[in-house]
Every structure is written in C-alpha cells, then in structure tokens.
Amino acid sequence: MRLLIGGLCMVFAVSAAGAQDAVALKRGEALLAKECSRCHATARTDESRHPQAPLFRTLAKRYPIESLEEALGEGLISGHPDMPEFKFEGDDVGAIIAYLKSIQER
C-alpha cells in the first residue's frame, strides 16, 4: 500500500511539473511574440520580417541558449540601430529560455 501511495505521489508531482513547464513555455512564447516578432521569427516555422533579424529557432547555432539568460535579465543591447533595448524580469527570463530551447532546430 505504501508503495502504491508513493508511486501515485510521484505521478502527481511529475504531472504538476509538466503543467508548470507548459505554462512557462506558453509564457515565453507570448513574451517573444509581443516584444520581438515585429522583426524576428519567434516560432518554429515563421520568417523574420527584418532581413538582419535572426530566426529564434536557429539561435543555438550561434550561442548556447543558456548564455542568453544574463543578457535577457540585465538588459539586451544590440549594436543594430533598429533593435530596441529589452530587459526581462526573473520568471520571464526563465520562461523565454525554456521556450527558446523548445523551438531550436536540431
């Protein structure tokens, strides 16, 4: 009986973690769509509207995705004149990183 209850607790914990991950992915997707999609391709299949804006699904070919965490939290500044500065808050940074990891081309 203890084994059954322990197993059920583990299943519920994994389900809750999966639900939180799904919420974070949706939040990251929404943030990037709102803040970045006027120039960048922020999804798995769209194209960038600005010719010099990289596709977000290919960022891992240029940088380790985790390396963007600090820049997103402290303020993202680009030398490109059309790119505005962005600074995201803690949970938003995590959601963006999770979403970016989920869409990378393999």
Question: Predicted segment positions?
Answer:
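Bacterial N-terminal signal peptides
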Residues: 2-15
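Electrostatic cytochrome c docking/interface patches
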Residues: 13-31
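His/Cys-centered metal/cofactor-coordination and adjacent catalytic loops
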Residues: 17-22, 45-50, 54-59
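The canonical Cys-X-X-Cys-His
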Residues: 28, 33-42, 96
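Short secondary-structure boundary/capping segments
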Residues: 28, 46-48, 74-75
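Short beta-strand/turn micro-motifs at beta-sheet edges
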Residues: 42-45, 70-71
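Extracytoplasmic electron-transfer domains, predominantly the class I c-type cytochrome c fold
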Residues: 55-101
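Short, solvent-exposed mixed-charge patches
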Residues: 105-106
